[in-house]
Curated annotation (Swiss-Prot):
GO MF annotations, alphabetized: damaged DNA binding; single-stranded telomeric DNA binding; zinc ion binding
ZnF segments: C4-type: 612-639
Assigned keywords, A-Z: DNA damage, DNA recombination, DNA repair, DNA replication, DNA-binding, Metal-binding, Nucleus, Zinc, Zinc-finger
Compartments, record wording: Nucleus
Protein name listed in UniProt: Replication protein A 70 kDa DNA-binding subunit C
Region of interest: Disordered: 139-172
Organism: Oryza sativa subsp. japonica (Rice)
Family according to the record: Belongs to the replication factor A protein 1 family.
Length: 951
């Protein structure tokens, strides 16, 4: 069945005054095409828009789709032949053409053939051209602003006398309206001595009425407009000689209403004028205030302001008014570039239909509106430019954002709070969803705060300080994440969260507009527009609280953020050798690491520089290097100012060294003060003013060879076409033995724990029985010195008759990280080789780490099945037939054999068994060989050490 289109709908819409339509016509889509913008800049990318040709079966009219309807075109729901019903639309005159802007529609039927033979409809109001020879001096502009709509004597220029055709005006709340005296759009005119004011029936407009008092006949010849002459219907605006009081409604589709009148060049009869479209209108702030005809006072238009929804805002509406609640407001920020500087702030708006949009104020507008805008209040906002939203910083569901102008825009607070407008609109995401989200994504979060860290002060890249505080958030998804609070959030809200967590209660917190990052795994941080509410009153909050109290508090949780140690932010702990070995800093982003090292050398030729002490508009110090003018004054090129006393700041270059190597690093003022404990100006005065070289040298020497924790920024930089790795110390603190011990113990605990959280080593690991001398497995690190009966792997030492090597012979020798002995490295240690051989032959794993326990992975010997020792130290019979190849007896290895070997392993010097020639206590027959190993500890038998470097 062929659908029924609304007859005459296109003509009715086209002849309707600018503004929202009052009918809901059924039309057919004849064509759909994307809107292409010529000479558009490559960035920012304009929002994608589509235009349609709509038909009522007889006439067609161009239309523009709201961006919210773009998905209907992309999924082919809207295509040629589709029959739709327009439920919300408006009609405006754009560049001399009537355009229907479709806000909402219903799709009634698809795949219909084109009904009838429709032709393009040209509105009668656009068929007449204004006389181009009309001089501007004969007209006067009027900036009458009313809350009614299209002006009955709208903006016009007096037409030629022969123009007698009747024309309807097209006023409205969304663009420059035309009134009863025609249009002056695009025509620049000079103010005249008299003016005719006008009112209409739609939203607040600025009607540009143009007429000339010289062209008007004397009062006796002039037809006086009154309520009878201007009221074809009961709903039409009325005008009296003394008052102008428009009614609240205008019959929108009656072409006979709101006729325009103008004074001809001669005579006193009003006639319909012509219009001139397609030229830019003169800004309203350049127009003089309205001057009414001398016929008595004119009353204020008290009709209600026409409000449009936020979703209907688009750049094609020069005049609009929205009613919305401020849901968020940013702090005022200072900015500067090479061309200008100023202030800026933004705020988010939400209306009763759920539409959201962001408004920005720059420079003078920021100073004017910042004090007026309050979060939670409802405002009427009119006039402002709409620009494409920068989605990198603005994630509201709108393609545009408002820029308020100090001369055009108006912001009026509503005295009564409109309860139909929600206070905030959330789109909560679960923490588990953040794992696969891209960085810089803006999200809303709701979760339980499980822990709060103390606040800390850090230095920004621009040189200013800011505060940060980290909290852990947990939700129903069984995931947790670290959220960083920045700036003012650390004080009020952060302190409140800290107190509640310390008291045992876990508050629930809602974030609006937090940003996802990849620091420390996955994390979330606040930004300038983020909103934070503690224990909000949402239905989701109660459900989350009940879950946490019943099961969530004790339920296992997976953290998306890497765990932090107890020393605040801990960047990866690295050695100096690892900087080169792991190619740190070679990628696009710098690497942030922490190095434990000592300062071995400080370059003192230029350890500081004179800096500009002036404050920049952004609130931080300039710090640019100042130049001495030679007359006692210093000059800054950036600030272009001269001053008498510069501020000296550190610019250090020094060498740091640890047990793996050394490298050069740089440090600026903050890190330099942490190293020397005094300002650069004091050190400069000691050396250059007091010329006390001895004290200066003492200060420099005082910082050498002390252990520090250096927080380094490692980045590859290019200088003179050469790439080099640069290490910059951004924070330096002296090593605290207590804190460092906690860090090391935590690292050891992580090594000792298997994935189930249970240690493979004995409970007394690392301790020796002082009575019996029996050893248990220990967790001592590779640099521990063993002087008791066991080494760091729990190996029982052999005690045998023999003399120890003198202490002097062990100086400056290497310390083995496996057996703890001196004189060799771990790579050639026979203990490690024997361990690998035994456990591989017995079906066990090699001892590559602390968790690799012989054979079966338990803490007992796999040979005798008894705890307290490893298989390599088993005193009982081995099940694998591992016996000493010298004496053929089980219970020990050849390196610990106390009897003479059958292979004739005797000292060739003294011809006595039990030791090798290198360990011979007697006189050597030849040149004395240097001894190897460290036999100071009596518990270490010489036979063990005799194996070093031999077999």
């Amino acid at each position: 069945m062929e659908p029924q289109l609304t007859p005459g709908a296109v003509q009715a819409i086209a002849e309707h005054p600018d503004g929202t339509g009052t009918i809901q016509p059924v039309l057919q889509v004849v064509d759909v095409r994307p809107v292409t913008t010529k000479n558009a800049p490559p960035t920012p990318k304009p929002a994608e828009r589509f235009r349609m040709m709509l038909s009522d079966g007889v006439n067609t009219q161009q239309s523009m789709l709201a961006t919210a309807l773009n998905p209907l075109v992309k999924d082919a729901t809207l295509r040629p032949g589709t029959v739709v019903q327009l439920t919300d639309f408006m009609c405006n005159t754009i560049q001399g053409k009537r355009i229907i802007i479709v806000v909402k529609l219903d799709v009634l039927q698809n795949d219909c053939i084109v009904i009838g033979n429709p032709k393009h409809y040209e509105p009668k109001s656009l068929t007449k051209e204004q006389d181009p020879n009309l001089q501007a001096s004969v007209a006067q502009t009027n900036n009458g602003t009313y809350s009614g709509g299209a002006s009955m004597l709208g903006p016009s220029v007096a037409p030629r006398a022969e123009q007698a055709a009747s024309n309807s005006s097209y006023g409205g709340p969304y663009n420059s309206a035309q009134g009863m005296l025609g249009s002056s759009i695009g025509r620049t005119v000079e103010p005249g001595p008299a003016n005719v004011s006008a009112v209409g029936s739609y939203g607040a407009i600025s009607a540009q009425n143009t007429t000339n008092a010289n062209m008007m006949q004397p009062t006796s010849q002039l037809n006086i407009m009154n309520a009878n002459t201007m009221q074809p219907t009961s709903q039409l605006n009325t005008m009296n000689a003394n008052t102008m009081q428009p009614t609240s409604q205008l019959s929108s589709l009656n072409p006979n209403q709101n006729q325009r009148f103008a004074a001809p060049a001669s005579g006193g009869v009003f006639g319909p004028p012509g219009n001139a479209y397609g030229q830019p209108s003169r800004p309203s702030y350049q127009q003089p205030p309205p001057v009414y005809m001398n016929r008595g006072p004119a009353s204020r238009n008290d009709s209600a302001t026409r409000i449009i929804p936020i979703t209907a805002l688009n750049p094609y509406q020069p005049k609009w008014t929205i009613k919305a609640r401020v849901t968020a407001k940013s702090d005022i920020r200072h900015w500067s570039n090479a061309r200008s500087s100023g202030t800026v702030f933004s705020f988010d708006l939400l209306d009763a239909q759920g539409g959201e949009i962001r408004a920005q104020c720059w420079k003078e507008s920021a100073d004017k509106f910042f004090g007026q805008i309050e979060v939670g209040r409802v405002y009427l906002i009119s006039r402002g430019s709409l620009k494409p939203a920068q989605k990198k910083y603005n994630t509201l569901n709108h393609d545009y954002e408002i820029t308020l102008d100090i001369g055009l825009s108006t912001v009026e607070v509503c005295s009564d709070d409109d309860n139909s407008i929600p206070r905030l609109q959330y789109n909560f995401r679960q923490i588990s969803e953040l794992e696969n989200m891209a960085n810089e994504t803006i999200v809303d979060l709701l979760g339980v705060v499980t822990s709060v860290s103390p606040s800390a002060t850090i230095m920004r890249k621009i040189g200013t300080e800011t505060r940060k505080r980290s909290i852990q958030l947990k939700d129903l998804s069984g995931r947790s994440i670290e959220v960083t609070l920045w700036g003012n959030f650390c004080d009020a809200e952060g302190q409140q969260l800290q107190l509640q967590c310390d008291s045992g209660s876990n508050p629930i917190i809602a974030f609006k507009g937090a940003r996802v990052g990849d620091f420390n795994g996955k994390s979330v941080s606040t930004i300038g527009s983020t909103q934070l509410i503690i224990n909000p009153d949402f239905p989701e909050v109660e459900r989350l609280r009940q879950w946490y109290m019943t099961e969530g508090k004790t339920a296992p949780c997976i953290s998306l953020s890497r765990e932090m140690l107890n020393m605040g932010r801990t960047d990866a702990r690295k050695t100096i050798a690892q900087i080169k070995d792991e190619n740190l800093g070679r990628l696009e982003k710098p690497d942030w690491i922490t190095v434990k090292a000592a300062i071995s050398h400080v370059t003192t030729e230029s350890f500081c520089y004179p800096a500009c002490p002036k404050l920049l508009p952004v609130g931080r110090q300039c710090n640019k290097k100042a130049i001495n003018n030679g007359d006692g004054m210093w000059h800054c090129d950036r600030c272009d100012e001269s001053f008498q006393n510069p501020e000296y700041r550190y610019m250090l270059r020094f060498q740091i060294q640890d047990h793996t190597g050394s490298t050069y690093a740089s440090a600026f003022d903050e890190a330099g003060e942490q190293i020397f404990g005094r300002k650069a100006g004091e050190l400069f005065s000691i050396r250059n003013v007091d010329q006390d070289d001895a004290q200066f040298a003492e200060i420099i020497e005082g910082v050498r060879w002390h252990l520090y924790l250096f927080k380094l920024k490692v980045k590859e930089e290019t200088y003179n076409d050469e790439q080099s790795l640069k290490c910059t110390a951004v924070k330096v603190e002296k090593l605290d033995p207590s804190k460092e011990s906690n860090v090391l113990l935590g690292a050891i605990d992580n090594l000792l724990l298997d994935p189930k959280g249970q240690s493979d080593l004995a409970p007394n690991a690392g301790f020796t029985d002082p009575v019996g001398g029996h050893g248990a497995p220990t967790s001592s690190n590779a640099y521990a010195m063993n002087t008791g009966g066991v080494n760091q792997f729990g190996q029982q030492a052999s005690i045998s008759a023999g003399m120890s090597t003198p202490l002097a012979a062990t100086r400056n020798l290497q310390t083995c990280s496996i057996c703890g002995a001196n004189g060799h490295s771990a790579q050639i240690c026979h203990v490690g080789a024997d361990m690998d051989m035994q456990e591989t032959s017995a079906g066990g794993s090699s001892m590559g780490n602390y968790n690799s326990i012989a054979g079966n992975g338990s803490s007992e010997c796999y040979k005798c099945k008894q705890p307290g020792h490893y298989a390599r130290d088993c005193p009982g019979q081995s099940t694998g037939g591992l016996e000493c190849f010298k004496c053929k007896q089980p219970g020990h290895f050849s390196r610990d054999c106390p009897v003479q070997s059958t292979g004739g392993s005797e000292c060739f010097k003294c011809k006595q068994p039990g030791h090798f020639a290198r360990d011979c206590p007697g006189q050597s027959t030849g040149a004395q060989h240097q001894t190897y190993g460290n036999n100071v500890a009596a518990s270490r038998g010489y036979n063990r050490q005799s194996f070093v470097g031999g077999y």
